[in-house]
């Protein structure tokens, strides 16, 4: 099943745009409206599974929190394990962490040290690609554990915020179903 223009337009139309959220001047792309539409949600998962079904993926990693909503069903569809990457203090076993920059300050992500094995071929999944900082930190965690990651998949790409280019510099090919301008 290759995505048709009609299917991609359906997905795009299922994502509501909220003006001035979370602050004035921002046009927020609300993927939760896609989740409310079972046809759109299933289609988004099916299209990602179809794209990666023959890629030799052994693990899917999803970033907190909306990456879980797409990553886990993609992992099931591919017949592989799902690994959550979370904010500090949310994972019960031994973890490693990676700090990354935000617009105003820094944040941190963690992964269980035993979640990725050396040689695992990992697909990173998240709901949205903006600047790429969260995904870059996630990729660093996976690589520190010996995993191989060359691809990241998203529902939405805010194409003018530089995320694709940032990931390209890390050797990551990004794929998204729905492009939107970031402003």
Swiss-Prot record:
Keyword check for Membrane: no
One GO BP: AMP salvage
GO cellular component terms given for this protein: cytoplasm
SUPFAM superfamilies: PRTase-like
CDD domains: PRTases_typeI
Metabolic or biological pathway: Purine metabolism; AMP biosynthesis via salvage pathway; AMP from adenine: step 1/1
Intracellular or extracellular location(s): Cytoplasm
EC category: transferase
Pfam families named among the record's database cross-references: Pribosyltran
Reactions accelerated catalytically: AMP + diphosphate = 5-phospho-alpha-D-ribose 1-diphosphate + adenine
Molecular function in Gene Ontology: adenine binding; adenine phosphoribosyltransferase activity; AMP binding
Keywords annotated in UniProt: Cytoplasm, Glycosyltransferase, Purine salvage, Transferase
Signal peptide positions on this chain: none
UniProt xrefs under InterPro entries: Ade_phspho_trans (IPR005764), PRibTrfase_dom (IPR000836), PRTase-like (IPR029057), UPRTase/APRTase (IPR050054)
Cell membrane in keyword set: no
Family as reported in the entry's similarity comment: Belongs to the purine/pyrimidine phosphoribosyltransferase family.
Protein name: Adenine phosphoribosyltransferase
Organism per entry: Escherichia fergusonii (strain ATCC 35469 / DSM 13698 / CCUG 18766 / IAM 14443 / JCM 21226 / LMG 7866 / NBRC 102419 / NCTC 12128 / CDC 0568-73)
